């Protein structure tokens, strides 16, 4: 089985220990269903997805970075520890949050860049992706009469 180790973005580092698959990812677990579905599809294709703290980096066939890390040295160190792994950058956040994520000079260390900016895609190194917005509904819906209202 091929192994892909995922490094969550700096804002979601609490999702290590594979929590990105069971507690969701981003604000209020917004992408939990999407990441769980991704993991299931990958497993069916013979690919194991785990956060990068679950196995030695040396064992990875690919290292998947969710957004650029704060330090370029983090990418270089990962490359040194897993020299045969493919390095993938998934640009997850918008240019408002991380404009530097979109600068090509910041992509030099990566073999593949996944972006939702279709203008950049060449279907070789730069590839397009669409992450479905899959919010989860609460397990129990409180009756309307039991809800409290708040106003600012």
Predicted features, each with a name:
Residues 1-84:
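N-terminal pre-catalytic "stem/leader" segment of glycosyltransferase-like enzymes
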Residues 72-152:
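Catalytic core of nucleotide-activated saccharide and alditol-phosphate transferases
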